[in-house]
Structure formats: C-alpha cells, structure tokens
Amino acid sequence: GAVMKQLRKQGAGPKAEKVALSTAQRWALVEKLARAGVISANKIPHKPLELGANMARNVISPDLLPTVPGPLPKGASRLPETPREGAQALYFPACINRIFGRPAGAAPDSVDLPRAVVELGRRSGQPVWIPDDVAGDCCGTPWSSKGYTEGFEYQATKIVRDLWHWSEHGKLPIIVDAASCTHGLLDSVPEALSEADKELWSQLRIMDV
C-alpha cells in the first residue's frame, strides 16, 4: 500500500519521471493508441504478441509497459453519445473501460460497459451524460501506484478541474464505472492537489456505479 508507493517513489529516476509526466500530458493520444493496439492485437496469435510485448518491456521499462495476458478482451467501442439536457448524473467512464471492451468469449450481442451504463440510466429514468472531451482524463492511479509524482499531480489536477467544470461546480453527481478509479478519486487524488483545487474537489459528489 502506502509503503510500497513510497518505495517506488524513491526508486523512480529522473528519466522515468520525465517519461511518466509526458505520458500523463498526452493521455488522450495514449488512450487512442492503446485502444487501436488492443483491436489489432486481437488479430494476432497470442504467442508472437506476448514475445513482442516482453521484448518491448525489456527495452523500455517493465513499470511503464504491461504484460500481455491471454486471451485479450476486445477493444472498446466508441463511447455512446449522450445529451447533457435532462441528465441526472455525470458519467465518467474509467480509461480502462475506454480502452478495453467486451471480454473474450462474450456473446456477440453483448455491449461494452459504458453502453450498458447509459442504457441502464435511460431505462430507469435516470439518464447519464458523458462529456464529449472525456478522453485524456484519468484518476491518476497508473502514476501514483508507481511513484511518479509529477505525472500523478498533473492528472489529479486535470481531472478535478474537469469534473468540477463538467458537473457544473458539483451540481451533478458523478458516477464512475471502476472501483479502483473511484477509490483513486476519493482517497489518492486529494493528496496531489493544491489548496485551491482541494476546495474544488470537496464540492464533487463521486460514487461508484
């Protein structure tokens, strides 16, 4: 937990910290490339894909590049369009659910989690709204868990300011579709904020789907 994060923070060198910050600043592009990569990877046999990923991890960094489990889930579909008017909640799809879609082996007529949440809201008479510019925002866990302070501070500040703006200064409740993301927003993000941004964060009503 906290001890491991501190150890990782102490072990993060300047080069890795710089790469992590650059990744945080370009997260929308990273999302797009990752999603395209998952879609492409589903067309490649698992063994060659795993070998290539491991080689890349050895060259770049095992901390920044994940292993390739198998079988891979599908790449996420485009987020559903939702109107702001009449919405009862702001829906923030976690970046993991903006990259990965249906699990391997899912029924052909099944839908991605974001579409399921939107449809559930519609049927229950509690429609949700997904901002058009949600790409590029993240709870910061990929950086905080590895001890990359600058990248974490950048994303924590960005998401709090965006959520505050999207929710009309806290008027709309915010629902999140990944427990780890909700936890990060509620427990970890405040540690990386300035006093002014902590005030914005305190006005947000964040809850797990």
Residue ranges and their predicted role:
Residues 2-209:
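Iron-sulfur cluster-binding electron-transfer modules in prokaryotic oxidoreductases
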